[in-house]
Regions:
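Interfacial loop-to-helix junctions that mark the boundaries of transmembrane helices
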Residues: 2-4, 27-42, 70-75, 107-111, ...
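Hydrophobic mid-bilayer segments of alpha-helices in multi-pass membrane transport proteins
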Residues: 7-21, 35-57, 78-86, 232-243, ...
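Core transmembrane alpha-helical segments of multi-pass membrane transporters/permeases
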Residues: 38-46, 50-55, 64-98, 113, ...
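Juxtamembrane helix-boundary/capping and inter-helix hinge elements in multi-pass membrane proteins
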Residues: 57-60, 73-75, 152-156, 181-194, ...
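Membrane-interfacial loop-to-helix junctions in multi-pass transporters
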Residues: 74-80, 104-122, 148-158, 227-235, ...
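Hydrophobic alpha-helical transmembrane segments of multi-pass integral membrane proteins
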Residues: 80-91, 111-143, 318-357, 362-363, ...
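Alpha-helical transmembrane segments of multi-pass membrane proteins
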Residues: 83, 113-126, 152-169, 326-339, ...
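Juxtamembrane and boundary regions of transmembrane helices in multi-pass small-molecule transporters
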Residues: 164-167, 171-227, 232, 383-384, ...
Length: 442
């Protein structure tokens, strides 16, 4: 075991000061729209890596390069990168029209009284199928505004219901970058993490649905939204969802989705062959920054681990959190703190992964449980911070339609993230240790 060295964590502090500090300056002082997302996160990590390279003069620069390279040779890192790109290609192939068909189909078969509840359920389904909360919010917020205008429901409630459903799907989806990052970082199968997550997320979703229905029955309603949809375009999402739940290899699931989506888009005339290839490239390109962040974090964390930074952090956490339940809470708060600082749940998970892995080993927490904790708590914090991408995208989408709404109007209606936190803490208290994992450790 390496000697504990708190100074080895300085690169993380440098990144947080750059990213969080400049984000606050841009967003709240200079009033730049979506200020946090004008900060080039790759540049911030490059500066942090440069600082890490300046530390520990006993290790030569060539040796530091080798240490960083060793961090990238992990099978989980390579798997994560390939899944990121494949998932991006899938989303590029099926496009927005397929997801719109999913949304409008579900809205068409439900009475107007339940339209806000349907928005929540649709967001859950679409986000689980698409693997992106931001994409789901971008897609469904205009529909939510239309529902509010046509039915008389409260606009913040409609938007918050979409955001809550989007975070549910982002947390559970097999092709979500948070799921990919958590599972590969902790070394567990996606189906195992899904099962662990499901029993935490599902009760929270059910209670959220009940709360929305209660509020809906206390509202005077008008008409209902009607729009054309294409049932055939729903097929790729359904196949991906079924394959993922059944535990089929994620690459097989995504390839089936890509092939079926390509055939359907070409057969229905939704896209030309040349455009289909372009869309594949655009979808993959959409994952480039996330992939590069994963690479840079792996390199930076390799140096921090070599310098003894993880030992220092683990030692500090162990002084506060005791036993299995304390370890679980420690992992949850660790990724939560990273998310508050970065306003990006995927980056938060990638940064927390190596530390959480060592914590899980020390506290006897199974990989599927630690992956579930990382994904769930990052989802909770990301779902309620007023400067997160999900909140900013929702507000921007509403503004583009000529309506005004603020984060502080939406937050009181964000029932799902709060109930997910309650469900997580309750599950943490009542569940027993994973006996299978403990037996393997012995």
């Amino acid at each position: 075991m390496k000697k504990s060295n708190g100074a080895a964590l300085i690169p993380i502090y440098v990144f947080l000061v750059l990213y969080l500090g400049l984000g606050i300056l841009f967003e709240y002082v200079l009033k730049i729209p979506m200020g946090f997302y004008n900060i080039p996160i790759v540049v911030a990590f490059m500066v942090a890596i440069f600082v890490a390279c300046l530390q520990n003069r006993k290790v030569s620069f060539d040796e530091k390069l080798q240490i960083m390279a060793n961090g990238l040779t992990d099978k989980n890192i390579i798997t994560m990168l390939l899944i990121f790109l494949t998932a991006g290609i899938f989303v590029g192939v099926v496009g927005r029209s397929s997801a719109e068909s999913v949304a409008y189909f579900m809205l068409s078969i439900i009475p107007a009284r339940f339209s806000v509840a349907v928005l929540f359920v649709v967001a859950c389904f679409v986000s689980t199928a698409m693997g992106t909360s931001v994409g789901t919010i971008t897609l469904l917020t205009p529909i939510g505004v239309a529902v509010a205008d046509a039915s008389g429901f409260n606009l913040p409630l409609c938007v918050a219901s979409i955001m809550g459903g989007a975070m549910f799907g982002d947390n559970l989806s097999f092709i979500s970058d948070t799921t990919i990052a958590a599972c590969n970082g902790q070394g567990c199968a996606m189906k195992d993490k899904f099962r662990a997550n499901f029993w935490i997320a599902f009760p929270a979703a059910i209670v959220t649905l009940i709360v929305i229905l209660v509020k809906s029955f206390n509202t005077e309603i008008g008409g209902v939204v009607q729009h054309d949809y294409n049932m055939i375009q729903i097929i790729p999402y359904v196949l991906v969802l079924i394959g993922g739940i059944a535990g089929v290899n994620v690459f097989v699931v995504l390839i089936v989705g890509i092939v079926s989506g390509s055939i359907i888009m070409l057969a229905t005339g939704q896209t030309a062959a040349v455009d289909l290839l372009t869309n594949m490239g655009s979808g993959a390109a959409g994952m480039f920054e996330t992939s590069m962040v994963a690479v840079l974090v792996a390199a930076m964390c390799s140096l921090i681990r070599e310098y003894g930074g993880f030992e220092a952090l683990l030692s500090a956490i162990k002084k506060v959190f005791k036993g299995d339940k304390g370890g679980q809470l420690g992992i949850g708060l660790l990724v939560g703190a990273m998310d508050i600082a970065t306003a990006n749940n995927t980056v938060a998970i990638v940064m927390a992964n190596p530390i959480a892995k060592e914590m899980a080993d020390d506290y006897g927490i199974s990989p599927k449980r630690s992956a579930s904790l990382l994904d769930t708590f990052s989802c909770i914090f990301q779902g309620i911070i007023p400067y997160g991408a999900q909140m900013l995208v929702a507000i921007s989408a509403v503004s583009e339609l000529g309506r005004e709404i603020s984060a502080f109007q939406i937050i009181p209606n964000l029932f799902y993230p709060i109930l997910l936190l309650v469900s997580s803490l309750v599950w943490m208290l009542i569940r027993s240790k994973d006996k299978t994992h403990l037996a393997k450790r012995r």
